[in-house]
Amino acid sequence: MKAHYGGQALIEGVLIRGRAGAFATVRGPDGRLVHREEAIPAGRRGPLNKIPVLRGVLALGDTLSMGSRMLMFSADVAAGGTGESMSTTSRRAALGAGAVGATVFAILPNLIAGRLRRRKPQDPPKGGIGQSLLEGGVRIGILIGYLGAISRIGEVQRLFAYHGAEHKSISALEAEVPLTPESVQVFDTAHPRCGTAFLLQSMITSTAVYGFIGSRSPFGRLATRVALIPLVAGISFEVLQFNARHLDSGIVQALNTPGMWLQRLTTRQPTDEQVEVAIDALQGAMAMDQRA
């Protein structure tokens, strides 16, 4: 069975997304498993979600929104709460923080690249392909440095272990093996449809897109970087969707290799208890699909 489930790591838990919605499982301080499910409204599965590129923008918005809510839920449960105390303000703040982070990540490489090029007056004018390539290198360098730095934090290492458990459980399902900790643990912590690969693909896409839109004005470059974030996300989504449908292709496997390597920074080997949480979340998402 080729089931296309995805998900993300939560604080002491895992979120799995299916066709009908998302199911989160979080282990509380007392060891009990706390669940939360969120169905995808029928309107979000309408005709707009079939339009290439646009569907990627909509999917990214849903992913960020739902992921933020579930992350807040997991934080509350992990702290000993019930997961029901999230306020609308807290949810909006989490989503806003993600939007601000994406904007800063689009702008900062441009500023750094501009500073580097000003030190080399023999270079061609700012903007265009040269500027975009330099930005792309800076952007990827920032990402790798950031992931490498936070991966040394103990709490983040646990989060990354749940990330690995999520990948292992989905790989086991796709391989049609029993969903038990023993069977799941034999799989790799990396997965070709991982969100980490989406980040890397977005950076590659942004380098290509920004390369065709040159501007001598620093403000113009910054404005276009922010304005084109949805387009970059939509194109990146389509590329990953294509790759997911052609995983048996040697070319696609080669293209996926950098993303698989990058996951060595964002995943860790999980314990059996962490794998149990991932399996529970996956089974919950499967049950939602069966009821839909």
Model-derived segments and spans:
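Divalent-cation
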Residues: 1-79, 130, 134, 152, ...
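Polar-ligand-bearing catalytic/cofactor-coordination segments
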Residues: 2-16, 116-138, 145-197, 242-247, ...
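Multi-pass alpha-helical transmembrane bundle typical of ion/small-solute transporters
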Residues: 47, 60, 64-89, 118-122, ...
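Residue-level detector of alpha-helix boundaries and kinks
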Residues: 49, 53, 97, 141, ...
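Hydrophobic alpha-helical topogenic segments used for membrane insertion/localization
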Residues: 57-63, 68, 90-117, 127-151, ...
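Soluble-to-membrane junctions at the N-terminal ends of transmembrane alpha-helices
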Residues: 82-99, 182-197
